[in-house]
Curated annotation (Swiss-Prot):
GO terms for cellular component: cytosolic large ribosomal subunit. The lineage of its organism: Bacteria, Pseudomonadati, Pseudomonadota, Alphaproteobacteria, Hyphomicrobiales. This protein is located at the 30S-50S ribosomal subunit interface and may play a role in the structure and function of the aminoacyl-tRNA binding site. Signal peptide: none annotated. GO terms for molecular function: structural constituent of ribosome. The keyword Ribosomal protein applies. It comes from Mesorhizobium japonicum (strain LMG 29417 / CECT 9101 / MAFF 303099) (Mesorhizobium loti (strain MAFF 303099)). This is Large ribosomal subunit protein bL19. The gene is rplS.
Length: 181
């Protein structure tokens, strides 16, 4: 394996460790969580639309999402392994027979709609993703609770140490005052 592919594989593994994208394909309506930096502030912005294409492979893979914003079609290309993509949530599965849905650019209204895939495979994928999402939320919540408990224990230990130090200082002060009398 040459150096470039090795570096790409390392970067892909690093990003995969942070977040795992669900399995989606053209025709699916997705909500992409994108990290946006405005000045010094960074926030996560949702971009919801229909996946009209997936291109590339490996580390260079990307997908195009199209949405209609104020009557104007807007398309955005997201690299799959971009650190700016926080996550992808599948809103609904589309039933299409093409890999590239560029024909949607010329369509408006009802003709631009994509029927929902209600097949067994789509239901299975949706259930798996829902279970994975719930497990991830439970894990994050458990981490928050553990962090809160650790912080409470640390605060209690700090307060106990402060009380002990104050009691020792008071005892030393009392010991100093007693021999003088």
């Amino acid at each position: 394996m040459d150096i470039i592919r090795q570096l790409e594989a390392e970067q892909a593994a690093k990003i995969e460790a942070k977040r795992k994208l669900p399995e989606f394909q053209p025709g699916d309506t997705v909500r992409v969580q994108v990290r946006v930096t405005e000045g010094t502030r960074t926030r996560v912005q949702a971009y919801e639309g229909v996946v009209i294409a997936r291109a590339g492979s490996g580390f260079q893979e990307n997908f195009t999402v199209r949405k209609i914003s104020y009557g104007e079609g807007v398309e955005r290309v997201f690299p799959v392994f971009s650190p700016m993509v926080e996550g992808v949530e599948i809103v609904r599965r589309g039933k299409v027979r093409r890999a590239k849905l560029y024909y949607l650019r010329d369509r408006r209204g009802k003709s631009a709609r994509i029927s929902e895939n209600t097949g067994v495979r789509a239901r299975k994928l949706n259930d798996e993703e829902r279970d994975a999402l719930n497990a991830e939320k439970a894990r994050i919540e458990a981490e928050k609770v553990a962090a809160a408990q650790a912080l409470a224990a640390e605060t209690a230990a700090k307060e106990a140490a402060e009380k002990k130090a104050a009691a020792e200082a008071e005892a030393a002060k009392a010991a100093e005052a007693t021999p003088a009398e």
